[in-house]
Amino acid sequence: FYGGFYAFAIAQVLIGIGGSLMSGSDSAIIYDTLLETNNKTSYTKIEGRSYAIGNFSEALAGILGGFLAVGSIYLPIYVQTSILFFSIPIALTLVEPTMHEENKLDRSFSAIMGVVRFAILDNAKLRWLIIYSSAMGVATLSMAWFAQPFFNQVGVPLAYFGILWAGLNFSAGLTSFNAHKFDKKGRNYSMLIYLSLAMFISFILLGFNNSLFGLIFILIIYLLRGIVTPILRNEININTTSNKRATVLSVRSFIIRISFAICAPILGYIAENYSLASSFYILAIIVGLFSLLASFRLSKLD
């Protein structure tokens, strides 16, 4: 209803606040509900399918949004706002797990910092899981950021950008939908090593393939994203208690975003002044170094 940059900026800030309030709570409610019903082994399956639905929705929205924008640039926003409205009555129907009433943390800054200290300093498994998540988060967020410049560089017609974007999100949804099949007790930390190597090699090969063939490696990165996200959330849930769960998951998300915020301008500068391939090589080093280090440390702690 209000055009201009400042209205857009305010809207983005409000969206960020809304996202931060939800951060960690959704996964924590799912896990604690399953814990309460003695069904926690189903978490990866449910989390994976929830994440898959989000990816499928984004894929569909990418296509429909393009068609709506042809009529008016504001039309996708009107439709999106209408859909978001339904989240309010849905949120009101959610039932808090009864275990959340036990051992409640104080709603104070010192209590929050205590959980941050627990996740980053006191609990070694959580620390390395968060470091691993941050490395993978930087990789996947950067790929989402660099996908369109890569499409442009290899000569993909603009008309196909939306279709490719939808296809990539759909592929992440497919692997996320089936992530529970990769989630085997006692094998996860060793499997993280293979996922790290696959991500590292994909970025290296993407840097070498400045052609349409490189789209295959972008696809692989999205497929890996669908697998690793639900499994990592499950591992973090296993290694924390219910009264700290939502905050620990929120700390994980915060560190991922901060890591990306630090890396993104540097990677963008390198892509602009040197080459996109150089950014992919640097990403390969960052992801390979931190994710492999974290996965090796986790395998020793297991």
Where on the chain are the PLM-derived regions?
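Membrane-interface helix caps of multi-pass secondary transporters
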Residues: 149-155
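Helix-loop junctions on the cytosolic side of multi-pass membrane transporters
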Residues: 80-106, 296-302
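MFS-fold secondary transporters
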Residues: 1, 15, 91, 205-206, ...
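Juxtamembrane helix-start motifs in multi-pass secondary transporters
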Residues: 76, 187-194, 279
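Helix-loop junctions at membrane interfaces in 12-TM secondary transporters
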Residues: 1-12, 205-218
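Juxtamembrane intracellular "pre-TM" segments in multi-pass secondary transporters
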Residues: 95-131
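Structural signature of the two symmetry-related core transmembrane helices
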Residues: 190-205
